[in-house]
Each structure stands twice: as C-alpha cells, then as structure tokens.
From Swiss-Prot:
Keywords: Membrane, Phosphoprotein, Transmembrane, Transmembrane helix. It is a multi-pass membrane protein. It is found in: Membrane. Its main location: membrane. Residues 570-581 have a biased composition (Polar residues). The keyword Membrane applies. Signal peptide: none annotated. The chain crosses the membrane at residues 14-34, 49-69, 78-98, 184-204, 235-255, 257-274, 275-292. The modification Phosphoserine is found at S486. This is Uncharacterized membrane protein At3g27390. Residues 566-588 are annotated as: Disordered. It comes from Arabidopsis thaliana. The lineage of its organism: Eukaryota, Viridiplantae, Streptophyta, Embryophyta, Tracheophyta.
Length: 588
C-alpha cells in the first residue's frame, strides 16, 4: 500500500482514517477502563506482598552486608548505616505507591496499544483480535510483572549484597573523606534550591515549541508516510501518537522538573570529587547550561545556550580509546537531515531483550559442545539444580556465549553485535532508544572494541573461552589447560586475557540480575531437574554407548523447550533465524 500523492488524495485519506481511528480508540478505552482496576489490583497486591514479606530480611541482611563488606571502608560503613533508616522507611512507601501508579497506567494503556496493533498489515482475523488482544495477555503480563519484581527483590538483591562482600582484585576499597562532607552537603542543598526552579522555567518555556513541532512532524509523517509511519503497519498507531503527544510533552516537563532535583544535588558530588566548594558552585551554574544545550539539541534549535557554563573540573577528562561512550544516534537535527529521501526498506525490529534471547540460543549451542568436551559435567548441573548454584552454568556458560557473540562481531568487522543468524546486527543506530538498553548494550560494544584492538589468535580465543567459562574454578581451569595445550603467552598478554575474562563475567553477572534472565534461568533449572530425574529412572539398556553424554542431552532439551518463548521447534527456530532482518522475536 503506497502513500497517497497530492493534497486532495492526502486529505481524503486523512478523513477516511478518522472514523477508523476513533472506533479503535473507543474500543481500546473501553478495554482499558475495564482492565485498569484489575491489573492495578494484581500488581499492587503482589508487589506489596513481596515488599512487606521481604522487608525484615532486607533490613537485617543489608546491615550485615554493609558491616561485613570488603569493598567499603570503615568510615563509609558508619555513614551508610546512619543513612539506612531513612531508606528503609521510604522503600515500602515508594514501592507500594509506584506499584499502584504503574499498575494503573499499564492496565489502562496496554489494551489500547494492543487494540491498534491488532489491525497491523498482515495480521489475520483482525476483527476478532481487535476485541481479544490486550485482555487476557494484559492480565498474564501483570502476573509476570509481579514475578519479575520478586526476582529483583530476592535474586538480584542478594546477588548485589554477595558481590559487595567480596574483595576487589586490586585490594582497594571505597572510603569517604569526612572533611569534605560538610561542604558537599551545603553545595547539594544550594543546588537543590537553585537548579530546579531555573530548569523548570526553561522546560516550561520550551514545552509549547516541543508540542507544536511534534504535532507538525507527526502530521507530516502521517500524511506523507515518512519517518515512523513509513510502513503501513504503523499507520493505525499514527492517530494515537498524535493524540497522546500532549501527554508526552507533559511527561517531558515533569521529568525535567524531577531530574533537575538530582542534577542540582549532583553538585555536592562534584564538590566532593574535586575537594573544592568553589567547583561545586560552578557546577550549579553550569548544570543549567548543560540542560539548556541538551534540550536545544533534542528540539533542533540553534546550538548554544544563553546561560554561562563555568569550568567545574580541575582537569578536563581526556577521552581514551575505550573509556568513552559508544556513539549514539544523532539528535533530531541529524535525523531530520536524513529524512529528505525516504527509501522504503525493510523494517528491522530489534526489541530491548533481543540480545538476551540470542544469548540463550548461544548457550544451547555451546553447551552441547562444552558438555561433549567434558568442560561441563553432571556436577555442574546438580549444583545448578540445588540452591547452591553453579558458577559454570549460571555465569560461565552465558559469559562464554556472549564472548563468542563479541568475537563473531569482531571477525565480521561489525559496527555493533552480530547475532547468530549472521545477518541481524544490533548497533547504536537500530537499538531501542531507551537508557536501559544503553546500560545493556554499550558495555559489550566497548569490550568488543578492546578485543578488536588486541587482535587475538584462534589459540588465544580458545584459551580465553576456557578462562571465561571456568574462571571461578581455578582447579578445573588448570586441568582443562593440561588437556588442551595453552598457547605461549607473555605476561602482558596473560594479564589482558585475565582482565577480559573478569570483565566478561562481571557483565554477565550484571545481565543475570535482569528479571527476564532470572525467569529463563529458573525454567532452565526446572527442566534440568526433570531430565535428571528421568535419566535416573531409565533402564540400563537405554544408556547406549552410541548416545551422546547425558549433559549434552540435558542442555539440548533445556534450551529447546517452550519455556524460552521460542516459537516453533528447534529446527523452526533455525529456519526463522535464517530469514535475517525480517524476523520478529517475541520476548516477554
């Protein structure tokens, strides 16, 4: 379906679109009004139960972890223990109120968006799905939200506390300078008093421009079928985006007001880091200019700011080849300059946890190989099933899969991360534009550039793989090196590989704290336990010497089950992955 050409055709298409849009919006509103209280009730009761039931454990374990932490100095321990009561009081209040608000918003808007998504191009039985989509699925996801919240409060919390009690490799720990605290606190208070009013005024003054320019852009894209509405499947959502744009502007203003509080309070951090009260005051003035320049760039206004920007650091930070941020997609100005000739190209749908889903595909594939080599044994699987946990299964195997994801991207000279299908690539240009995904993707891109600069040989890559997989078990690492000859390494090269292994395991531990990862891993352990019980009950005649080792069968069956939300069988997944950019991965 091509976009209309000419003013009359565009106007006719627009008038024809209005009743279609109003009908879908009305239906979505009805479903949202019905489901909003139910979803809000489920999320509020579930999250409140998790918060209140774990609160005593959190209080006791947090104090114990801080007191026994090896990464925190004694003075900082006392300071944190004095600040903890305020955090303990605020946590239930903020958590429960956030659950009420989040549950209500999700219960209302999720059916609306699902209603519009049901009439996308190529969707079968559109009339039925207009009524059905967003009803039962929203209720199911509300229970998933509670489960993910429980994983964060339980698994992720204890994982962070355990890491806090571990000593750093360089034997350093964090400490606080008491003499700098009074000045830093005074600067923070001044920043909170000065920055929020000024930044709020700037945001309010720029909000009308953002409102009308956004409407102009959305109407232009809708009629001319450019930008986000280039694909026909996006057209039904166009009217909803136009209608909700004032809410987006209001949210941007509210977000600016809230963030200005933290921006002003950060002046105390600058004062503490620079050991200077004066530099903290300079940051209070410069932060207004920083916000003004950022908002100017977003709104495609002339560069610069009318506010002064004094120097607030003793020494300018010099960017290093690997310490700087990964380049992101440019501002609206850069994007608008590329809009002149819209080329109708296939749309690549990269979802925020697409890389995480590919990680489990890699784990399944490499798990079979590693089990065949004996690097993964039955003891690892037994520990993964127990509450003790297995470092090799829970951290080593995902880190191994991510390592070869990075190495494959390096060999292909990819600007991002090349997925296992050899076609789909996650870059800073097509990745989801939320800050959460920056935290997810950017560390791996930085590590990829570091490995690319190191120029590893195949023997060094294999050694690094064993190092990543068995880094938490030195004895098994030595035995694996005895079986597979270790390449001749200089002290510098060995130190580099050790640093890469520590970095990979650290990043994997961070990823393992994401709620979705934990849900997948629980399904893995559950299926693992079932397969082991089934194996124990099998007769001796079923254990043929021609069969692959038990860990191979177990890992293969684990990662091929529907618990990983892969549509179709393993072969079906492989065929689907070969379609490259046209695939649409369903990740919950």
């Amino acid at each position: 379906m091509e976009p209309p050409i000419g003013f009359r055709a565009s106007l006719f298409q627009f008038l024809l679109f209005l009743p279609y849009f109003i009908g879908l919006l009305f239906l979505g509103f009805i479903k949202g009004i019905v489901l909003c209280p139910l979803v809000c009730l489920v999320v509020t009761i579930g999250n409140s139960a998790v918060i209140l039931s774990l609160l005593p454990v959190h209080i006791v374990w947090t104090f114990y972890s801080i007191v026994s932490a090896k990464q925190v100095g004694p003075i900082l321990k006392i300071f944190l223990c004095l600040c903890l009561p305020a955090a303990i009081i605020l946590w239930p209040i903020v958590g429960i109120l956030g659950s009420v608000l989040g549950g209500a918003l999700y219960g209302f808007f999720s059916p609306i968006f699902a209603t519009f998504d049901a009439v996308g191009e190529g969707k079968p039985y559109q009339f039925f799905h207009c009524f059905y989509d967003g009803t039962w699925s929203t209720m199911q996801r509300s229970f998933t939200v509670v489960r993910d919240f429980k994983d964060v409060c339980f698994h992720s919390y204890f994982s962070l506390m355990d890491e806090l009690k571990q000593s750093c490799p360089d034997r350093k720990y964090y400490e606080i300078r008491l003499l700098q605290l009074p000045g830093a606190l005074v600067v923070s208070v001044l920043g909170i008093l000065v920055d929020p009013p000024v930044i709020s005024l700037v945001a309010i003054c720029k909000s009308p421009y953002m409102l009308f320019k956004g409407w102009h852009r959305l109407f232009h894209d809708l009629i001319g079928r450019e930008g986000p509405f280039l694909e026909t499947m996006c057209v039904p959502i166009a009217g909803l985006a136009i209608l909700l744009w004032p809410l987006a502007v209001t949210g941007a203003v509210i977000g600016s007001v809230i963030s200005s509080i933290f921006l002003g309070a950060y002046a105390g951090v600058v004062s503490y880091q620079e050991s200077s009260f004066y530099y903290g005051l300079c940051y209070i003035v410069a932060s207004v200019s920083i916000y003004d320049e950022y908002s100017t760039d977003i709104l495609d206004l002339p560069e610069g700011s009318c506010f002064p920007r004094p120097k607030y650091r003793r020494k300018d930070e010099e960017p290093t080849p690997f310490s700087g941020p990964v380049p992101r997609l440019g501002s609206v100005k850069n994007a608008s300059s590329m809009r002149g000739g819209s080329v109708r190209v296939p749309m690549i749908d990269i979802k925020p946890l697409d890389l995480l889903n590919e990680l489990f595909v890699e784990c399944r594939r490499y798990g079979e190989v590693l089990a065949t080599k004996g690097l993964i044994n039955s003891k690892d699987i037994e520990e993964a099933r127990s509450s003790k946990g297995s470092q090799v299964i829970s951290v080593g195997l995902p880190a191994y899969g991510l390592l070869y994801e990075i190495l494959r991207s390096v060999k292909a000279n990819s600007s991002g991360l090349l997925l296992s299908d050899g076609v789909t690539e996650i870059t800073t240009m097509n990745r989801p534009k939320d800050v959460f995904f920056d935290w997810f993707l950017n560390p791996f891109l930085i590590l990829k550039e570091q490995m690319k600069a190191t120029n590893l040989s195949e023997e060094e890559e294999e050694y690094l793989g064993r190092l990543v997989l068995l880094f938490g078990d030195p004895e098994r690492l030595k035995s694996s090196n005895a079986i597979s000859a270790s390449p001749p390494l200089t002290e510098r090269k060995r130190a580099e590989l050790d640093a890469f292994a520590r970095r990979m395991q650290g990043l994997t531990k961070t990823v393992s704290r994401y709620p979705t990862f934990r849900r997948h891993f629980v399904a893995l352990v559950k299926k693992l336990s079932e397969d082991l019980d089934l194996k124990d009950n099998n007769s001796a005649k079923d254990e043929s010497i021609t069969e692959p080792p038990a860990p191979v069968k177990i890992i293969s069956r684990i990662f091929s089950q529907r618990s990983f939300r892969r549509k179709g069988s393993v072969n079906g997944s492989d065929q689907e992955s070969q379609k490259g950019v046209s695939r649409n991965v369903d990740i919950v």
